[in-house]
Amino acid sequence: AEVAMSSALAQMDLQPLCIAGTNVLLLELPYYRRFRLKDVETIINRNDIQVVFAHIERFSRLWNKETFAAVMELPVYKQINCSSLCHARWRQRRQLLRWLSDGEVHLLGTDAHNLTSRPVNFQAAAQLLQRKQRTAELETCMELAEQLTEDGVQ
């Protein structure tokens, strides 16, 4: 599960919050518009963890363009949700596909919370990417996910 961003995280031992057996922290950025980017950078600059921003697509319309651009430029992996890809209107889907093709987004996540109202929907996103001739991007996402979860980050 993702960890909600808090300035207190910079002072904490983050290993217990990482994906089991790795040093990968799935970080959910704040939903409020005014947050301290410096707090996020402090966490990113730690040597003991690898940060992945969870469902980054949610913030493109929430924050102002400058804040979103600054976050997208940070040297971390970024993840989008399969449901966003599958259920987006054509303009947003085109943007998500562009981010994948340009290497700005690196991972797909399901954001599954249960088997009924928010089930795993990875297969639908994979099929969509194949239909849109984005098989290479799908494979890149899968390889990185495997690397991060099996090996952790060295």
Name what the model sees in each region.
Residues A10-D13, E41, N64-A69, W90-L100, ...:
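Charged helix-capping and loop-helix junction motifs
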Residues E2-A4, R58-L62, L85-A88, H113-S117:
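Active-site environment of divalent metal-dependent phosphoester hydrolases
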Residues Y77-I80, L85-H87:
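Aromatic-anchored helix/helix-loop segment that forms the rim or "lid"
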Residues T22, L74, G103-E104, A136:
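A short helix-to-beta-strand connector/capping loop
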Residues E104-V120:
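Short acidic/histidine-rich active-site segments
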Residues L27, A88-W90:
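Extended, charge-rich low-complexity interaction segments
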Residues F122-Q154:
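Mid-to-C-terminal alpha-helical segments outside catalytic/metal-binding sites
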Residues A1-Q79:
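Extended substrate/RNA-proximal surfaces in nucleic-acid metabolism proteins
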